[in-house]
């Protein structure tokens, strides 16, 4: 295998032949050059011969002289083969009486052949024994990018990878063993000499070992990654009749074997590729990319007629604004090198549709100078287009490569932020006189420039599907009368009388027109002239509008309306309030029949408590006698005007919005606020009380404990105790009640519990948050004995050790403590009104 320095592959770089014009014969006898007359006659015959070739006119126009002769010979050879193979009658060949019938049959065969080629996943290839392409179907262009006229009667080795040429030569031999002397010259392609066999030396045509199935890599112009496409060849060796070749001695040679195969891509195409592979179309452009022609497939895909396509002006009007600079770069490359390379961009089709295409443009020369451009486009799917767009964004620095440009979303060539302000001339006499700077318009750009093509495009083609609007468009392009009213409010605050009058003409669209324009000559129609005149009569100029724009841009309507700003909204408040309301609603529905007894019992309990307070007022000073009553009133009826209080539930800060509590009568004395945990050390959080029935959701961090309520009352005292790590109660519980109790010590003892202590009103404590349940006392209260504090009790020792060692904050409690050992002697127990639920007897994680 050669090093590949002199290896050449097939390409499509050929010059267009010179188009000769018929010159009139001079009237006088002017001498002419005989050689020139000979060349003119030869060119005339070649043009006539080229017109007889069965190829489209656009293919014929770019053929050179040698290609015309090559294709003419190939056509004659193919016709001779089919004459023998199809065994057509002389009458049909010479145009006998059945000429009309033959034309109908040929037309039907042609249509059937075209349909078969379109349905075939590949192309037909016939290669002779001397490695010349005898025939290639027109569908070769869909897979390799070569025209049918580019490969016919050319060496097949120019298409095959150098590493696969030996294998292809072996497959051409009938015994898979070509002569070793016939080596493939990798630099020039075909072998130096061909060996011809007689029919006696060749096997029958229908032999099984004449079948072929192999793979090799072919040169592909559509693949930019490697330049080759792996193809699978499947066919058989057959005799090529009708060639009438002669040997060196002049004797007629017998028909030789040739490879008839179908070449298919090794990787099967997807459904979308099968759908789009037959829609490759070509367009013809001037050197400035102005369209001057389009084939039938292009008209079918884009939806334009050739007249509509060629009368619009620059071809950049059909290109997406985000792809213009990318296509312009390929355009410049084509002018410099003659070929643009594969370029992926979006073309605007009819009915407001964008089509991704992969294009390759070539420069066609005439008389040694560039004449026009031929562009070959292949439609792509949207997924393929977006993939190419992502690859392009990594290599190109400007933002237009990513498709995110907003230049095409506004009417002005510049965005409102980038739009240059008119230069005003300040004067003491009038503020209406101003001299604007020259604003860009459609006429200020060159007709063939990119900006001119961009301005000529309709804005609506970029709004379907709607894209994200520019920041200023949401306020000014799509503004409403309500927003104009908000502008008026801002002007009133500034005290501008002229701005107050702006509401009459303050529509957002008019404001946008005023922003993008200048004096009256910039408004071509009468409507905009009237707008400009009204603005001048009201004393409003563009500087005022600019200041109004800036003020409106940084001011939101919600703030002006007095609404709460988003940053002031506590999401946790809303969540906890919703949970609380849901629990309250469900509880009220389940226990509606119990609401009336609850209120009555609470009222009775309060009245009894107040009677005790009146008795104790005779023995204690008024300030001290009034304090426990305030505590009880506060525990029964919490504050109703509390806002959202921040509390910590299970170690997490949250917000809690209390709902209105159940009301009851307390005519004896005015209820006052009681602040539990009023002196916290290291924290400033407040704990609202929850008097609603079953207002606190069920939690695992809850230990039920039931204690009776005793009437005795003593002075309050402050006690330092830890906020965590309480041990569970050692005393037995009597029911599944959702209450807990808290022990108090009298004021005259610093490290012990008073023998006069009783139990305070039951309260539920949750890991930093506290709620109050409404309680029902029994029909009567039975006094019980009081239990003295004993140091031998293990529960008391453990409790006091924690109190002494881990004091976190001070808290004021009532000194009413009940006997722990006589809890079962009470006649009525406090209980929760909601449905009883079994709770696990575990150590709580919070306060007890």
From Swiss-Prot:
Which organs or tissues contain this protein? Expressed in all tissues tested including brain, heart, kidney, liver, lung, muscle, ovary, skin, spleen and thymus.
> Whom does it interact with, and what assembly results?
Homodimer. Heterodimer; efficient DNA binding requires dimerization with another bHLH protein. Interacts with ARNT; the heterodimer ARNT:AHR binds to core DNA sequence 5'-TGCGTG-3' within the dioxin response element (DRE) of target gene promoters and activates their transcription. Binds MYBBP1A. Interacts with coactivators including SRC-1, RIP140 and NOCA7, and with the corepressor SMRT. Interacts with NEDD8 and IVNS1ABP. Interacts with BMAL1. Interacts with HSP90AB1. Interacts with TIPARP; leading to mono-ADP-ribosylation of AHR and subsequent inhibition of AHR.
Effect the entry attributes to changing residue 65 to E: Reduces the binding affinity of AHR?ARNT to the DRE by more than 10-fold
What GO terms fall under cellular component here? aryl hydrocarbon receptor complex; cytoplasm; cytosol; cytosolic aryl hydrocarbon receptor complex; nuclear aryl hydrocarbon receptor complex; nucleus; transcription regulator complex
> What organism is the protein native to?
Mus musculus (Mouse)
Null allele outcome, as annotated, is:
AHR knockdown in the retina results in reduced electroretinogram responses, thinning of the outer segment, and degeneration of photoreceptors.
- Record field: compositional bias (Polar residues): 436-449
GO MF annotation, one: sequence-specific DNA binding
Indicate the impact reported for residue 758 to A. Answer: In allele AHRB1 and allele AHRD
Q: What is its main location?
A: cytoplasm
Q: What does this protein do?
A: Ligand-activated transcription factor that enables cells to adapt to changing conditions by sensing compounds from the environment, diet, microbiome and cellular metabolism, and which plays important roles in development, immunity and cancer. Upon ligand binding, translocates into the nucleus, where it heterodimerizes with ARNT and induces transcription by binding to xenobiotic response elements (XRE). Regulates a variety of biological processes, including angiogenesis, hematopoiesis, drug and lipid metabolism, cell motility and immune modulation.
Write the protein's name. Answer: Aryl hydrocarbon receptor
**PTM annotation, UniProt:** Mono-ADP-ribosylated, leading to inhibit transcription activator activity of AHR.
Q: Where in the cell is it found?
A: Cytoplasm; Nucleus
Q: Where is this region: Required for maintaining the overall integrity of the AHR:ARNT heterodimer and its transcriptional activity?
A: 49-81, 116-124, 260-262
